[in-house]
From Swiss-Prot:
Subunit annotation: Homodimer.
The name this protein goes by in its record: Histone-arginine methyltransferase CARMER
Annotated organism of origin: Drosophila yakuba (Fruit fly)
Catalytic activity field: L-arginyl-[protein] + 2 S-adenosyl-L-methionine = N(omega),N(omega)-dimethyl-L-arginyl-[protein] + 2 S-adenosyl-L-homocysteine + 2 H(+)
Function: Methylates (mono- and asymmetric dimethylation) the guanidino nitrogens of arginyl residues in proteins. May methylate histone H3 at 'Arg-17' and activate transcription via chromatin remodeling.
PTM comment: The dimethylated protein is the major form.
Keywords attached to this entry: Chromatin regulator, Cytoplasm, Methylation, Methyltransferase, Nucleus, S-adenosyl-L-methionine, Transcription, Transcription regulation, Transferase
Cellular location(s): Cytoplasm; Nucleus
Enzyme Commission identifier(s): 2.1.1.319
One of the protein's GO biological processes: positive regulation of transcription by RNA polymerase II
CC per GO annotation: cytoplasm; cytosol; histone methyltransferase complex; nucleus
Amino acid sequence: MSSLRPEEARKLATAASVSPLSNCQFSGVVISSIADEQKLEFTNKYKGSCTLLCSYDSQGVVLRVVSDDDQSHVLKEYMIAADTDAAQMGRRSYAVSLDADNLVLRFASDQDQQLFRKVVENVKHLRPKSVFSQRTEESSASQYFQFYGYLSQQQNMMQDYVRTSTYQRAILGNAVDFQDKIVLDVGAGSGILSFFAVQAGAAKVYAIEASNMAQYAQQLVESNNVQHKISVIPGKIEEIELPEKVDVIISEPMGYMLYNERMLETYLHARKWLKPQGKMYPTHGDLHIAPFSDESLYSEQYNKANFWYQSAFHGVDLTTLHKEGMKEYFRQPIVDTFDIRICMAKSVRHVCDFLNDKEDDLHLISIPLEFQILQTGICHGLAFWFDVEFSGSSQNVWLSTSPTAPLTHWYQVRCLLPMPIFIKQGQTLTGRVLLEANRRQSYDVTIDLHIEGTLISSSNTLDLKNPYFRYTGAPVQAPPGTSTQSPSEQYWTQVDTQGSRNSSSMLNGGLSVNGIGDGMDITHGLMHPH
């Protein structure tokens, strides 16, 4: 076998060590079908030679076949997985069984055949299940990476002004932590955080992305002429190898209720590449939990379940499913936003230290609760939100999803109790929230609450993987009973005040319609009463 040229050797090394399932392509490949296995007779499957496009996928490598003459049209797409049958045939040919096709691929060079063989071997064997694969169902992983492989989903996150601008401010405001440093971007997506690191002066950024978004990130890197700074590596951080340790790890690993999607475990796993005294952006996360009262939300979910209480729905008795319907609706966490005045006590804060906590710490999270109730009412459940801090050498920056902060794409989350509890001001509400990780990249959330000194308690278990997205974009309404003055009188006082101003304006040439000046926005008082 002839020796490899430096460029081929570099490509092989990259495929084998930096990214075991890296993207690559092979031109001038002649593809034949095995027509008769006994006689080893072959027929050309496609007219002329083809190009094979290999791209990383969470389940293996996607192999796309296109014509050398027209690469815009995909002739066939295959998946090379761990159970794919394949064998070398001579120096330039490779036999592989894909779907129902038994193919022989004849490559343009010995080196191309070697590289393709290395790609297949890296998928097929010798790699024990990674930490990620052990904790994640294949179907969940496939859906997860497919979801984040869409540009529209990346756009949704990038257009979250609070999220994106806070990350940029945290990184650029601590340029001393990035100047001439080696940076690791975990779950890079479009690569936007990698670009921020380069803006702050990073010498090198390794952008790790397991979804097909990696190819788009590479396009952005090349079109912005920063390929000498940013290296996009397709793959999971649990599976890839880096050529060196890093000074800083950046990532956006937070999900609903901070922990959903279990990306935080991946973020903590990445510390194996962090130098001693290295930085993590963000540095820690605070999960806030508070009891809330919201009769409207509770009634909404309860009435949905009552659909199954009909005894004559088109002549069919549905009532046997009412109990299960009720259970299903109340197992759904509610994703929306609310006025913080519905909270009946100061929030309890649970801290996750990204620099020191271990991955195993996030498999079972037990949070003790103790609330001093500030207002009498009915507790319908618990509200959750989170803040994360970027602890830099120059400044600390916070990203908050609190109901008192500008709204983000994380919103807030509320977990209802099927049996609400009446509680009085001054009483103590105790209990526990238990987050139990599952292989669907989420958590089962168990809530237990008890009014101290009584026999009154309530509990529920919810499926964080299956939330109800309730947010409609409508303005958040103040809780009932929070007005301490007559809203009607407040409004008309405002009208009178603005009318007087407009009368004064008329004396200086202003116009008036029905006694109300043209400079007055009467909808403001209706939509935003003080």
